[in-house]
Amino acid sequence: MKLEYDLDTYLEKINNNNSYFQTFINKDSLAAGVLVLKPGEEDTQTPHDSDEVYYVISGDGFLKIKDKDYKVSKDKLFFVAKDVEHFFHGNTKELKVLYFFGGPDS
């Protein structure tokens, strides 16, 4: 079982693929990964089956949760309950975010 993860490895995978996110832990009880949005890039995620926590590594913009926009900036944390509509938008700088699910990434 892998216990150590190098975030730069997963950021490079995103840079080399057509995806804007990379899940690097995907267990029954927990999933974790990183999301990178370039300025103006669309976040196409849909509601998840598990609660989720976001940690903003860098960048700016907004996280829309239901009908409210929350300002995104470095070192902010956000909680999104399962099955709740949410997405990042309006970033003028590259946005890097760690995400954690209370269950598998589905």
Task: Please provide the spans of the model-predicted regions.
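Short, conserved beta-strand element in jelly-roll/cupin
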Residues: 36-37, 48-63
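Structural motif
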Residues: 53, 60-62, 69, 85, ...
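Well-ordered beta-strand scaffold positions
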Residues: 30, 35, 60, 68-70
